[in-house]
Amino acid sequence: MVRGLFIGRFQPPHWGHVWAIKAILSEVDEVIIVLGSAQFNYIEKDPFTVGERIWMLREGLREGGVDLSRVIIVPVPNIENNAAWLSHIKSYLPPFQVAYTGNPFVAMLLKEGGVEVRQQPIFDRGKYVSTRIREMMIKGDSTWRELVPNSVARIIDEVKGVERLRVIITGEAEPHRW
């Protein structure tokens, strides 16, 4: 059995993520999806909690026709030691044989740790980017809904994610600066 690794923040999950995961599953038997930065939430870059991201990702994958029995979702908090990062990640995961990433820095860390790295399948990178989707939400551009599965949009509505983002950007959501 070949198990692949796919790391992301999924803030929020979008169709590009779903399509990448489907493409990865065409090459491996199972995929471990790491929800990185698991400890961060309610900040502009990471507005959703890890629980909300798990929920959105599972529902978005289900809507996209992904067999969830082949998917393992694992939240992993960040550490501030890049040399120890791979060991940290591995301590949370079952064994994997290959990793998929489009991030050159992450690829370097994985390769230095002896992991086979493959290019992450990328679908219309200019369009399907979580940063862009969050910016659209903040600006009131409702076409962000076209970029995410309907189930993800419903969850964002349910948790009042757009309203949350608009409050976060006021600067009042920075307790570390109080």
Swiss-Prot record:
SUPFAM superfamilies: Nucleotidylyl transferase (SSF52374). Its main location: cytoplasm. GO terms for biological process: NAD biosynthetic process. The keyword Ribosomal protein does not apply. Keywords: ATP-binding, Cytoplasm, NAD, Nucleotide-binding, Nucleotidyltransferase, Pyridine nucleotide biosynthesis, Transferase. Pathway: Cofactor biosynthesis; NAD(+) biosynthesis; NAD(+) from nicotinamide D-ribonucleotide: step 1/1. One of its GO terms (molecular function) is ATP binding. Belongs to the archaeal NMN adenylyltransferase family. This is Nicotinamide-nucleotide adenylyltransferase. It comes from Caldivirga maquilingensis (strain ATCC 700844 / DSM 13496 / JCM 10307 / IC-167).
